[in-house]
């Protein structure tokens, strides 16, 4: 089932894939990594001025990694703002997705966390480095094929 935004993207020749609607009726779209930044700018100009959240997950062991963006269109006098969910999939071998930091500044720490936990590199992010794990940490803890080390060095907090 194609939603209103999916139909609008088709009308304007913007490549995407409709993933239908979630349990709350929010339209979900899949965008290719190479198209994501330009389509993000279009959504911002169209009125999706608030990035509510960004997260990432490992689709399947040895499979793709996904970066998920929840956008909201906030307008004065509107009781129920429009929401949109975007999924961008990246290969496990070289997971690269354009950062949307320059579109929505609120994605700063969220893209860093996705990098830290899953190893997705967000191109043109101004401070892409680990945020939860030490810089010396090897591997990506939330990947399904991650093997946890047997030994954790406890560092002095002082």
Swiss-Prot record:
HAMAP family: NDH1_NuoC
Name recorded for this polypeptide: NAD(P)H-quinone oxidoreductase subunit J, chloroplastic
InterPro entries (alphabetical): NADH_DH_suC, NADH_quin_OxRdtase_su_C/D-like, NADH_UbQ_OxRdtase_30kDa_su, NADH_UbQ_OxRdtase_CS
Domain of life: Eukaryota
Gene Ontology biological-process entries: photosynthesis, light reaction
Subunit composition and interactions: NDH is composed of at least 16 different subunits, 5 of which are encoded in the nucleus.
Subcellular location: Plastid, Chloroplast thylakoid membrane
Matches recorded under Gene3D superfamilies: NADH:ubiquinone oxidoreductase, 30kDa subunit
EC number: 7.1.1.-
Catalytic activity: a plastoquinone + NADH + (n+1) H(+)(in) = a plastoquinol + NAD(+) + n H(+)(out); a plastoquinone + NADPH + (n+1) H(+)(in) = a plastoquinol + NADP(+) + n H(+)(out)
Keywords: Chloroplast, Membrane, NAD, NADP, Plastid, Plastoquinone, Quinone, Thylakoid, Translocase, Transport
GO molecular function, one term: NADH dehydrogenase (ubiquinone) activity
Assigned GO CC terms: chloroplast thylakoid membrane
Pfam family, one: Complex1_30kDa
Main function: NDH shuttles electrons from NAD(P)H:plastoquinone, via FMN and iron-sulfur (Fe-S) centers, to quinones in the photosynthetic chain and possibly in a chloroplast respiratory chain. The immediate electron acceptor for the enzyme in this species is believed to be plastoquinone. Couples the redox reaction to proton translocation, and thus conserves the redox energy in a proton gradient.
Chief location: plastid
Keyword Ribonucleoprotein appears in the UniProt entry: no
Coiled coil residues, start to end: none
Topology in membrane: Peripheral membrane protein
Family of the protein in this entry: Belongs to the complex I 30 kDa subunit family.
């Amino acid at each position: 089932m194609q939603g209103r935004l999916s139909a609008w993207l088709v009308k304007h020749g913007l490549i995407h894939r409709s993933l239908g609607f979630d349990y709350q009726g929010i339209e979900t779209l899949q965008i290719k990594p190479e198209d994501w930044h330009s389509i993000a700018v279009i959504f911002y100009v169209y009125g999706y001025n608030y990035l509510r959240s960004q997260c990432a997950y490992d689709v399947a062991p040895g499979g793709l990694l996904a970066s998920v963006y929840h956008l909201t269109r906030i307008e004065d006098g509107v009781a129920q703002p429009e929401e949109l969910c975007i999924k961008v999939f990246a290969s496990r071998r070289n997971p690269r997705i354009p950062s949307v930091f320059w579109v929505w500044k609120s994605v700063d720490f969220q893209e860093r966390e996705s990098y830290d936990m899953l190893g997705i590199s967000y191109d043109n992010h101004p401070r892409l480095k680990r945020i939860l794990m030490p810089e010396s940490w090897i591997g990506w803890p939330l990947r399904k094929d991650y093997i946890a080390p047997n030994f954790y060095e406890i560092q002095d907090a002082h």
